[in-house]
A protein has these predicted regions:
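Hydrophobic/aromatic beta-strand patches that form the interior of the parallel beta-sheet core
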Residues: 46, 148, 158-160, 231-235, ...
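Active-site gating loop/helix substructures
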Residues: 138-225
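Glycine-rich anion-binding loop/nest that anchors nucleotide
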Residues: 209-216, 230-239
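Extreme N-terminal leader/targeting segments of oxidoreductases
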Residues: 1-11
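Residues at the starts of beta-strands that form the adenosine-phosphate
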Residues: 41-44, 144, 229-232
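C-terminal helical/tail subdomains of lipid-metabolizing enzymes
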Residues: 237-239, 259-349
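Active-site periphery "cap/insert" segments of enzyme catalytic domains
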Residues: 109-147, 158
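Patatin-like phospholipase
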Residues: 9-17, 22-120, 157, 162-170, ...
């Protein structure tokens, strides 16, 4: 694959990192559409959980400009979220039986089928279909999308397709994109975990990437000591840790009625965003993060109405528009990068 020449790169270019957040992913879509409407060309997208759904579909659609901004919005608003709560078909006790049998309330098969179908409609089945032509990237990173997953068997964060060969001995080009997304959104105790068998026959249990890092905005940051050629914008729909679990999962707000529940609230909050909080507090990181107001939507509210989804979409669009109104790439480089990178930018982030 030949590296992209400078004249082939649009003047407004960015990589994106999309946080997890369950059904709040619609807010991510609103932010991405605002970037599209502003003229940005997105080169690569990293996603966690709900962000992995958005990221892979947008990466697939970007090949040949298959979806307009209006079509992206309508696709997000028409996701059959209610069907994604696919419990074992037993009246009344279905979710309970699923939890006892599989340590999860729901199977996740409906979500998997929908994701696989939408990707197929865009011509994407395996990661080889999302190859990215950039010779100045490490071979394992030459893909338009990457999803973050937690491997609880080996106790590590894995980024697929980047880590298929290193961790599992598998050819990334032959692995299913939909399978990786399904693993990234396997919220513990809500969706069944995903099992991946390595080339050596070892079985790993994969769950939601947000368990270890829900907003890895550093994913595309360069490791070779050279400056970035274009920015990486992060979009998050999860409140800061100071907002507590009530802002993240409103259905759990009654926990505050019990003094002894404070520790549980703090534990849940820390699991969702604590790993990333210190890094995100750094000024050179927070300045490139788009924060979408989503506190009135539970991350697991799969019965949410279309009206509320549209408001969440609008919040995302507004957040990105406000961000772009003050964003200055040259000023960012001068303030945070100039002292460290004396050479001109070369190659992707």
């Amino acid at each position: 694959m030949a590296a992209r020449r400078a004249r082939d790169i649009p003047p407004l270019t960015a990589d994106l990192v999309l946080s997890g957040g369950g059904v709040r992913f619609v807010g991510l879509v609103g932010a991405v559409v605002a970037l599209m409407d502003a003229g940005y060309s997105v080169q690569r997208i990293s996603g966690v959980s709900g962000g992995s759904v958005v990221g892979t579909i947008l990466a697939a659609a970007s090949q040949g400009d298959q979806l307009t901004a209006a079509q992206v919005k309508e696709l997000a608003l028409s996701v059959p979220l209610r069907s994604w709560r696919d419990a074992v078909p037993l009246p009344l006790v279905g979710p309970v039986w699923g939890f006892l049998r599989d340590t999860a309330l729901y199977r996740g098969d409906a979500a998997h089928r929908w994701i696989r179908g939408e990707l197929a409609n865009l011509g994407v089945h395996t990661w080889g279909d999302l190859a990215y032509p950039a010779d100045d990237l490490m071979p394992e990173r030459r893909y338009r999308a990457v999803v973050t997953v937690t491997d609880v068997t080996t106790g590590q964060l894995v980024r697929l397709p980047w880590d298929y060969r290193r961790v599992y001995g598998l050819d990334p080009d032959e692995q299913s994109v939909a399978d990786a997304v399904r693993a990234s959104m396997a919220v513990p105790f809500f969706y069944r975990p995903v099992t991946l068998t390595s080339a050596a026959g070892l079985r790993s249990t994969l769950v939601d990437g947000g368990v270890l890092s829900n907003f890895p905005i550093y994913t595309f940051d360069r490791l070779d000591g050279r400056p970035p050629k274009w920015p990486t914008f992060g979009v998050t729909v999860v409140p800061e840790i100071s907002d507590g679990v009530g802002a993240m999962v409103p259905v759990l707000r009654p926990l505050r009625l019990f003094g002894q529940a404070l520790l549980l609230e703090n534990l849940i909050s820390t699991m969702l965003v604590g790993h990333d909080q210190t890094y995100l507090n750094q000024p050179w990181v927070s300045v490139r993060a788009i924060k979408v107001n989503s506190t009135d939507v539970s991350v697991l509210d799969f019965g949410i109405s279309r009206d509320r989804l549209e408001r969440l979409y609008d919040n995302g669009y507004a957040a990105a528009s406000e961000f772009l109104s003050t964003w200055d790439w040259a000023a960012y480089l001068q303030r945070f990068r100039a002292a460290h990178y004396p050479d001109p930018p070369v190659g992707p982030n």
